[in-house]
């Protein structure tokens, strides 16, 4: 590159270049922490997101939150339902839509997973100040807003 880069541009390059790597690192750490629970990595996020929603989340909304295509999510939900962790119900306001709920076993597992993730977050991010945490979240929010504008 012939163009001289100032410090701000270099830092922005490091930030954008590090996003994918950091996501992979986090996934590896979470997989390591949650691996003993007998649930696949792929099933963990849908299960957690259903729990965090309070239940009754539409399948389409969950797919959007996870950035997944419907058919890929359906396969994971089939596994979670077969494991008696999630149940599907028809949405009374739109029979074409499914609502997703945790079963009793699903609630118990999600609580254990969330407890483990709270500890992991403290281990990884505990040295960050509140201002630093807010700065990271602001960067992610700006990225999401730019993606919404562009795509």
Region annotations inferred by a language model:
Residues 60, 78-138, 145:
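Charged, amphipathic alpha-helical coiled-coil/dimerization segments
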Residues 46-47:
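Short alpha-helical "packing" element that flanks the helix-turn-helix/winged-helix DNA-binding module
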Residues 63:
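The alpha-helix within a helix-turn-helix
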Residues 1-37:
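N-terminal leader segment of winged-helix/HTH proteins
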Residues 1-7, 130-151:
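C-terminal regulatory/oligomerization modules of transcriptional regulators
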